[in-house]
């Protein structure tokens, strides 16, 4: 554990937080100044975190680094305890990149710009707080704070059903997060002594197996909602379908990853014994997510809802990796979170770019867009190839790593591994089907046989641009392809996707030392339980069905 000489992590959190409260007092009538201010703050914070991790972070150290701990409210055991390790560091960088580029993507926001950028910076700070908090109560507070800006960003700047989608998101996530608070209180109070929510100290406690199972189940619900695990996923398509593109970039690129992070940090890290019993369930849920998400995505005729269900499918690989009991599998789960964060962000951004021109997300109303927007077509195609795990893209590296982790696991029976990999492969086959069909519906064809729809008043039909079955009138008198700002955002994501695809160690070297340490603790717990609970583990390699059934005994 390395204590920081300077509060670097606090600075990374407080910079966007304090800057957000300056926005209301900045003199600006048209919102142009606050736009540049928010972008400058986001970029400065991202540069700061890059400097900290390049100069102050030791990649070879699996322990917590840059540790800061101050007794904040000692009466209830709350402390300002923040630090990073291999699990949190890459996700902090992901949050910084995605949020900064989403601010740039929101450049045309002209409705209540002060409030919009205030909420974006507040969300920026809360995201970082979730990933660096090492006090469970502080983690819960950051988790809750993050809900407020997301709710407002969706409900104010969303589509026609924005209030319904925002309320559904809030109810799902707020209700589920209660389990985090309950689990924290139970662990803090167990064993007597001074109350503490410090995760390191909570990890040293020896909880009864029955208590661990209950706490694990509660945390699984809380993180399962955020990770969009079936059947807790239904808020996600609605939220993405109604949220603006910059908000969808953060929802898919960062917020989903909080669920996976929580499973690794708390469920595996603090409750390794319970993880032994729940791991097969996670593997089964992962397969269900992969297949269900793929089928559901193919059935969507709204572009953003199709991408949302594809996220449900891709998060199934995170569950498989976490459940694998192998170093390679957990590494693949981390790589999948990072890869999907980049891929989902660029796809939702390009969906927003397309909507800005066509004013529709209905796939059956599009067609032939490639002729009018060749640059967007090229960028969208590259993003789709990454999502369907084309070799040379980060999606391929992450998913093949998860498969290797599952197949090489010595915990599950051969039958279980073969069936799991086979069913997950079905999802891989379905992925190009729903993505390539979306590309065909949106970009291919000539768009010649269309009915003109005057969606803007006082405009001539001669200014219409035709797509598929309808023609629309863009905001500008002349139709335009992707602009330099939009190209820069998309290329920034795609460059990283390709770089990680060709050289995965760009990402894996950040966290592999830590994921090996986490898996080592789980493997040790597995060995101890297998030696003492012969009624559950018939042999060194346990029977999975008995393992799952034991949970309900």
Swiss-Prot record:
It is a multi-pass membrane protein. GO terms for cellular component: plasma membrane-derived thylakoid membrane. It comes from Microcystis aeruginosa (strain NIES-843 / IAM M-2473). The gene is ndhD2. One of its GO terms (biological process) is ATP synthesis coupled electron transport. GO terms for molecular function: NADH dehydrogenase (ubiquinone) activity; ubiquinone binding. NCBIfam families: NDH_I_M (TIGR01972), PRK12561.1 (NF009212). This is NAD(P)H-quinone oxidoreductase chain 4 2. It catalyses: a plastoquinone + NADH + (n+1) H(+)(in) = a plastoquinol + NAD(+) + n H(+)(out); a plastoquinone + NADPH + (n+1) H(+)(in) = a plastoquinol + NADP(+) + n H(+)(out). Disulfide bonds: none annotated. The chain crosses the membrane at residues 6-26, 34-54, 87-107, 115-135, 136-156, 169-189, 210-230, 244-264, 276-296, 312-332, 333-353, 376-396, 418-438, 487-507. Keywords: Membrane, NAD, NADP, Plastoquinone, Quinone, Thylakoid, Translocase, Transmembrane, Transmembrane helix. Belongs to the complex I subunit 4 family. It comes from the Bacteria. Its main location: membrane. The keyword Translocase applies. NDH-1 shuttles electrons from NAD(P)H, via FMN and iron-sulfur (Fe-S) centers, to quinones in the respiratory chain. The immediate electron acceptor for the enzyme in this species is believed to be plastoquinone. Couples the redox reaction to proton translocation (for every two electrons transferred, four hydrogen ions are translocated across the cytoplasmic membrane), and thus conserves the redox energy in a proton gradient. Its EC number is 7.1.1.-.
């Amino acid at each position: 554990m390395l204590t920081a000489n300077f509060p670097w992590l606090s600075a990374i959190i407080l910079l966007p937080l304090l800057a957000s409260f300056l926005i209301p007092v900045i003199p600006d009538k048209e919102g142009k100044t606050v736009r540049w201010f928010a972008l400058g703050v986001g970029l400065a914070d991202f540069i700061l975190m890059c400097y900290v991790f390049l100069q102050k972070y030791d990649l070879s150290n699996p322990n917590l680094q840059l540790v800061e701990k101050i007794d904040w409210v000692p009466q209830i055991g709350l402390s300002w305890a923040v630090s990073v390790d291999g699990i949190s560091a890459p996700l902090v960088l992901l949050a910084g990149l995605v949020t900064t580029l989403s601010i740039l993507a929101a450049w045309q926001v002209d409705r209540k710009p002060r409030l919009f950028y205030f909420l974006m910076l507040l969300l920026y700070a809360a995201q970082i707080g979730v990933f660096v908090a090492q006090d469970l109560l502080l983690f819960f507070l950051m988790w809750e704070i993050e809900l407020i800006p997301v709710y407002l960003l969706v409900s104010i700047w969303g589509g026609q059903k924005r209030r319904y989608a925002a309320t559904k998101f809030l109810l799902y996530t707020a209700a589920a997060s209660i389990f985090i608070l309950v689990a924290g209180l139970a662990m803090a109070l167990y064993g007597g002594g001074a109350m503490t929510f410090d995760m390191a100290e909570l990890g040293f406690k020896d909880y009864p197996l029955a208590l661990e199972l209950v706490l694990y189940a509660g945390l699984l619900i809380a993180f399962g909602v955020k990770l969009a695990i079936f059947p807790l996923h239904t808020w996600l398509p609605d939220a993405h379908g109604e949220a603006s593109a910059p908000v969808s970039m953060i929802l898919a690129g960062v917020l989903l990853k909080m669920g996976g992070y929580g499973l690794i940090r708390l469920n595996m890290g603090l409750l390794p014994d319970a993880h032994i019993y729940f791991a097969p369930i996670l593997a089964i849920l992962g397969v269900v997510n992969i297949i269900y998400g793929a089928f559901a995505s193919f059935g969507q005729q709204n572009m953003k809802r199709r991408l949302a269900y594809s996220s449900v499918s891709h998060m199934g690989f995170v569950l498989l990796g976490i459940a694998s009991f192998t170093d390679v599998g957990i590494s693949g789960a981390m790589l999948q979170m990072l890869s999907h964060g980049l891929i989902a962000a660029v796809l939702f951004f390009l969906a927003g770019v397309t909507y800005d021109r066509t004013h529709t997300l209905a796939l059956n109303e599009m067609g032939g867009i490639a002729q009018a927007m060749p640059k967007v077509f090229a960028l969208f195609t590259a993003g789709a190839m990454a999502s369907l795990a084309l070799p040379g893209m980060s999606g391929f590296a992450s998913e093949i790593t998860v498969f290797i982790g599952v197949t090489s696991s010595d915990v599950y029976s051969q039958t279980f591994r073969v069936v799991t990999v086979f069913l997950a492969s079905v999802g891989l086959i379905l992925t190009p089907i729903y993505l390539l069909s979306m590309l065909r519906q949106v970009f291919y064809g000539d768009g010649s046989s269309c009915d003109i729809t005057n969606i803007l008043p006082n405009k001539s039909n001669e200014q219409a641009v035709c797509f598929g079955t309808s023609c629309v009138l863009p905001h500008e008198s002349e139709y335009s392809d992707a602009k330099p700002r939009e190209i820069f955002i998309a290329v920034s994501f795609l460059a990283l996707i390709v770089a990680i695809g060709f050289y995965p160690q760009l990402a894996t070297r950040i966290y592999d030392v830590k994921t090996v340490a986490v898996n080592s603790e789980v493997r040790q717990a597995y060995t101890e339980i297998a030696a003492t609970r012969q009624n559950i583990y018939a042999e060194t390699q346990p029977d999975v069905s008995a393992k799952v059934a034991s949970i309900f005994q």
